[in-house]
Amino acid sequence: MSARLISNSIPNLLNGVSQQPDTVKLPNQSTLQENGLSDIITGLGKRPPTEHIAKLNTDTLTNSKVHIINRDSNEQYVVLVNNQSVKVYDLAGNNKTVVTPDGLTYLTSTNPQEDFNLVTVADYTFIVNKTKTVAKSGTLSTARPDEAIFYVKNGQYRTTYEITIDGSSVASFQTLDNSNASNASSITTDNIATELTNDLNSNLSGYTIVRDGSIIYVKKNSGTFTAEVSDGLGGDGLILVKDKTNSFADLPYKGYTGFVVEIVGDGGTEFDNYFVQWDGTAWVETVKDGLDNSFDTSTMPHLLIRTADGNFRFCKADGSSYTVSGTSYTEPEFASRTVGDETTSPDPTFVTRKINDIFFYRNRLGFLSDENVIFSKAGKFFTFWATTVTTAVDDDMIDLAVSHNKVSILKYAVPFNEQLVLFSDQSQFTLDAEEVLSAKTVSINQTTEYEIDDGVKPIGLGQNIYFGISRGSFAGVREYYVNADTEIKDALDTTVNLPRYISGDLNGLKGSSSENTLFAFASGERSSLFVYKYYFDAGSKALQRSWSKYKFVDTDILLDGDCIQNYLYMVIKRADGTYLEKLNLKTNEVDTGLSFPVL
């Protein structure tokens, strides 16, 4: 039988590569597309060239972490982070000075590309090393001495006021009766306190005793003591305040500067207890003494600070001071616990654990650690403690865990569609909140169950999030979306028809929502850039899904890049060093002085 000649027209070649059999693939798909650009306006053409910007350095490292700082339209920088090294360049390729007073040991890594995550907020770029375990400072706050306050609250005629220390009566005073008007001075609270103080000074040694009006402060200089009072007035005449009291109303009108007492509240639980301290003018909420209330800043995320002179400073966030052009500045500092104790204001859950991701959401800095999401206090990116334990405050820090029937270690967080999408190895969750993000309004719900490649951070582009998946020695990309009609969340495999196309593991996902383009950097073919072009109509129907690749010189290693203002900036390692280049994504733009593009 002779072969039949079949003739048919192909309307376009816009849907890129497919590895399906010819009988199955779409007419506008091909088996190979290299250095071609599938554009829904101009059709299939040649990809734009890269433009050389600068040779950054002579380094030949192949796994640098690349981060682009897009501060504003006038200031953008490329950050290269390596083992105990951080370098910064502007987008013209000029090297910026990076002062490193401390903290470079935090950047110890054998695989910077996977171990480091960065996020930029204004002049601060936070760098987290995912291999570091967060620790406390190891320094306990100074413990208060054993102390007490005796408060003469009421004076009555012919009443005995007595103080007992360690089981022995050490001070006693009986007021006069009311038979004579001159006896009225006997019952003033100041007089009673004076008489009791005189007895205390006479009968006690090794104590510090201070009277202030009707208040008597007693401190044992070494060791502890017990104390009791009696007044013949049912406990309403002479009040003892030592260690703890049942109610804030039980406190005297004044105290001794630095004196701390615990308000125990409901005796059935410790969760409503709190501590107050006399600060010299008022009783203010404070923290229990003798606790480790601070982080070891050498284990916390570090800072790359853009300084006033346009250069940079890499350091711990420990509040150190520095000078630029004669002006003094102070580095930010991670706040310490200032209220409560380990029960009412517990350590954030990232303590003794590793931080897997760092992000910014609704004016809060956020960490992912184990199964928990931890947010800073709103607007206070260095505060991860409650500011009061007496009530729930909307802008306080938030620390909550995902709920699932299997272990779900959270790896990445991506803001999306007014929500925060959380990725674990096998599941996806959404963090939802009402108009105000607070511990009272926030919730986490599981949405989809897809395995991810946890070596590459997902990226949000337009109405979708793209995340990597592993197929053995190849990789793929899923497209997470919300169905506009049903609001059901799902993740479509964009590489289902080319399962053996992206070689190796994904090193990076970057893209431009204005140009409907996703770029994938892969470990198995580091001289190529995998390109996904997509287009959706007004009803969210996909009119284009096109995978292809841009090939570079075989010896080139594409480290990573990012998109800024319709340009893809790429850091490329070559045999003699590291280069910065850019690729124009505006397909319909012509070259200056010409009426047509030069390819």
What do these predicted ranges mean?
Residues 1-95, 248-409, 469-489:
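N-terminal beta-propeller domains
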Residues 2-74, 475-599:
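Beta-sheet repeat architectures centered on beta-propellers
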Residues 56-74, 111-121, 347-361, 402-417, ...:
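Structural signature of eukaryotic scaffold interfaces centered on beta-propeller domains
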Residues 77-79, 126, 364-367, 419-421, ...:
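Conserved beta-propeller blade signature
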Residues 83-87, 131-133, 215, 364, ...:
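Loop/turn residues immediately N-terminal
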Residues 113-134, 420-423, 430:
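Elongated alpha-helical scaffolds
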Residues 436-473:
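Catalytic or ion-translocation cores adjacent to nucleophile or general acid/base/metal-coordination motifs
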